[in-house]
Amino acid sequence: MNNEKMKALQAAITQIEKQFGKGSVMKLGEEHVLNVEAISTGSLSLDIALGIGGIPRGRIIEIFGPESSGKTTVALHIIAEAQKSGGTAAFIDAEHALDPVYAKALGVDIDNLIVSQPDTGEQALEICEALVRSGAIDVIVVDSVAALVPKAEIEGEMGDSHVGLQARLMSQALRKLTGSINKSKCATIFINQLREKVGIMFGNPETTPGGRALKFYSSVRLDVRKIETIKQGDEFLGSRTRVKVVKNKVAPPFKQAEFDIMYGTGISFEGNVLDVGVDNEIIQKSGSWFSYNDTRLGQGRENVKQFLRENPSILLEVENKIREKHNLKTRNTADSKVTGAKDEKSKEEK
């Protein structure tokens, strides 16, 4: 580009920045545009599948799946991770079903979690917009899109038809929200349910409520499915969960992650590190025996999980080796999950 064109471009950029503020126009190669900050999901395998070490800040994320698949559990783990790194989180509970005892067990600081239980969809999305615009929130969870009932539907009669009202509400709200979300670097998570399309002979009959707008505006879409129940004898301990990254604008999509969600305690971090460690050949598996370097970890998956829980230094070492292999930021003892979990236990014992 010749000098005159460069001067003209610089003058235009200066004028735009004067009118609309610094950062309103920029070169794509600038460092702060390329670096996408992330919040961990609490699952090492899911952080790897997402490609950047977690969900992106300043973007819209949709988590969808069947009932009791672990959607809210994943969202609560993201809140816990954001709070551990000094962030502030909000939970818009449109379903009026948030369990504070379970949230606390997952590591959420419920004393500092901002919660709203709105009456209408409009109220929920206005609260969401106000929190995003404040610039003080790191992550907002809306649970769920299906429960964002338009005011006209709530005030109407039970049998009235309200075709397309919710889709219109979501489309309008997302048009307003998307710019503010990006500027404030607030990760906004919408949890969504599944519905069946009527009369579909071929292809996937499953769809998500709330229209198509959320699919378009989301930078990341996570499909959460329960694949099996974890049992020990006759006792049900939890469920094996598979998450597929069906859309990803910040890294290659279609990657999958599997982890255990244990009843009452959420994602089993030790089990997740064990699985990823075996997949990456950092932990050796021979029959039902597991070993790391010269250390015998134990026989049977549940026993090894218990061993890793009791030996946080080995767990952290394995985790950091996995992180290095996938070009993710390593952890030190202070911010490791196990330390946090043990600190919580010791607080409760006191």
UniProtKB/Swiss-Prot annotation:
Instruction: Please tell me where ATP binds in this chain.
Output: G65, P66, E67, S68, S69, G70, K71, T72
Q: What does this protein do?
A: Can catalyze the hydrolysis of ATP in the presence of single-stranded DNA, the ATP-dependent uptake of single-stranded DNA by duplex DNA, and the ATP-dependent hybridization of homologous single-stranded DNAs. It interacts with LexA causing its activation and leading to its autocatalytic cleavage.
Gene name? recA
**Can you quote a single GO CC term?**
cytosol
InterPro entries associated with the record: AAA+_ATPase, DNA_recomb/repair_RecA, DNA_recomb/repair_RecA_CS, P-loop_NTPase, RecA-like_C, RecA-like_N, RecA_ATP-bd, RecA_C_sf
Q: What family, per the record?
A: Belongs to the RecA family.
Renumbered to this chain, region (Disordered) spans 326-350
- Per the record, where are the segments of Basic and acidic residues compositional bias? 340-350
Specify the superkingdom: Bacteria
Looking at the keywords, is DNA repair present?
A: yes
Q: Where is this protein localized, as stated in its record?
A: Cytoplasm
Tell me which UniProt keywords the record has, alphabetically: ATP-binding, Cytoplasm, DNA damage, DNA recombination, DNA repair, DNA-binding, Nucleotide-binding, SOS response
Gene3D superfamilies according to UniProt? P-loop containing nucleotide triphosphate hydrolases
> HAMAP family, from UniProt?
RecA
GO terms in the biological process aspect are: DNA recombination; DNA repair; SOS response
Coiled-coil parts of chain: none
User: What protein is this chain from?
Assistant: Protein RecA
Q: Show the taxonomic lineage.
A: Bacteria, Bacillati, Bacillota, Clostridia, Eubacteriales
Q: Does the keyword Acetylation apply?
A: no
Q: Which SUPFAM superfamilies match?
A: P-loop containing nucleoside triphosphate hydrolases, RecA protein, C-terminal domain
Question: Which organism is this protein's natural source?
Answer: Clostridium novyi (strain NT)
Q: Name one GO molecular function term.
A: ATP hydrolysis activity
